[in-house]
């Protein structure tokens, strides 16, 4: 889908890999170097990209649990101080990411695409409306979607008898697309493969 958007909008695709970024300043400098009117900025698998994007609510629960499980006040204070030091080691922060996306890189017509398999672990501030204008879930394909993919890929309608034997909501769009590509010289075999 990203390639299709790139082709349609005549924009280059730039992948931003947060794991390779040392701190907020480096992120800001990278985004400043990108012409957002000619670019699609992609943060792929953002749930795995950095601890900075994970929900703060879970982090706070973990810290509270660790601190309240100990009985000694002095031990609690030492543990809390150590946890704060560990958190500061990561110089790429959620605040830096949000400010970079909203401020420096904020320009009319920008396209930023984030992909994730686990949106529930992301901090709500990262995916709130206004920051992320559209969320699209790619669930498993029903028969209609498989038929449309087949038609778009091969330029002809799928055999309705074979199509009716394909289980619905089992295969991801990526899986179906891969089969269509694998059987490009024998299209009907792609459908037969999906019936098994």
UniProtKB/Swiss-Prot annotation:
Protein name in the entry: Putative AAA family ATPase L572
Alphabetized PROSITE patterns for the sequence: AAA (PS00674)
Similarity field: Belongs to the AAA ATPase family.
A GO molecular-function descriptor: ATP binding
Residues annotated as binding ATP: 32-39
Disulfide bond positions: none
This protein's UniProt keywords: ATP-binding, Nucleotide-binding
Database matches in SUPFAM superfamilies: P-loop containing nucleoside triphosphate hydrolases (SSF52540)
Keyword Electron transport annotated: no
């Amino acid at each position: 889908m990203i390639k299709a958007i790139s082709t349609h909008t005549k924009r280059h695709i730039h992948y931003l890999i947060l794991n390779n970024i040392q701190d907020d300043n480096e992120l800001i400098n990278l985004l400043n170097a990108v012409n957002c009117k000619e670019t699609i900025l992609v943060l792929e698998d953002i749930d795995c990209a950095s601890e900075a994007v994970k929900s703060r609510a879970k982090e706070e629960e973990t810290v509270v649990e660790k601190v309240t499980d100990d009985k000694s006040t002095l031990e609690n204070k030492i543990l809390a101080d150590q946890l704060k030091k560990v958190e500061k080691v990561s110089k790429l922060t959620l605040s830096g990411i949000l400010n970079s996306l909203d401020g420096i890189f904020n320009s009319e017509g920008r396209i930023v695409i984030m992909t994730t398999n686990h949106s529930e672990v992301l901090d709500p501030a990262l995916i709130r409306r206004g920051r992320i204008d559209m969320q699209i879930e790619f669930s498993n394909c029903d028969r209609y979607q498989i038929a449309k993919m087949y038609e778009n890929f091969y330029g002809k309608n799928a055999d309705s008898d074979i199509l009716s034997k394909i289980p619905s909501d089992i295969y991801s769009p990526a899986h179906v697309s891969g089969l269509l590509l694998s059987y490009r010289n024998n299209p009907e075999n792609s459908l037969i493969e999906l019936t098994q």
